[in-house]
């Protein structure tokens, strides 16, 4: 979200490399990288050595790779098959970067939005949506497509030695913890789990310590941001109303050992806010002996 907030969706290769330099200058050594469509994936893949060399030179690593292909949930079987092939290419790129996890989204169903469609052109928060359900839309059919695609992606990820995770997001097919648990149950794989995104789940009025308890060992990765519990803004931790100590006590109890990604964006003085977020998490970790 850092590079996207500063340089667009998706950022160009030049801006991506600049973002890596800036993130490492701020003291971060574990990085998440996204591929937001087939063209962006090709650009990253064609310049994989350049990206890897830059990370290595700065003592950084790409721990999570996030390919975003909306056609994974298309009603058109040919489009879905193409998206699956692109996902496999993405897993190969994740292997090149020595990533530990590969992540995607569950996307927005084919509804009719009168105005802005969530996450289509940009990542924006606090929007009011106007939605119409098309006469031919059937949730059961869409859910079956989603589950099938997630199963296929999981098999590919597993074959490449990668854990596969999905992020519940406001405005998408899986938008809360219980929907995520339903998807985990449907996919039926020990290799498949969740990204606990604090900003999105808090905006869904969830009790985050309970969310962590529900997901338990199925939490593979964490996105850290804060908000007021009404809008899904992604502010630095401490600027909203999340019970951070309560959440981290549960994460400690369930034995979470993965990465915490500072996932703030679309805020003034982003670099300063990133550094403050990092310090907040470090102090909390020291306090709770994480």
Which residue stretches match the model-derived regions?
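Glycine-rich, proline-tolerant flexible connector loops at the mouths of alpha/beta enzymes
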Residues: 32-52, 107-114
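Histidine-acidic metal/acid-base catalytic patches
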Residues: 1-2, 8-29, 73, 98-100, ...
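Conserved radical SAM core fold
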Residues: 35-38, 69-72, 109-111, 226-232
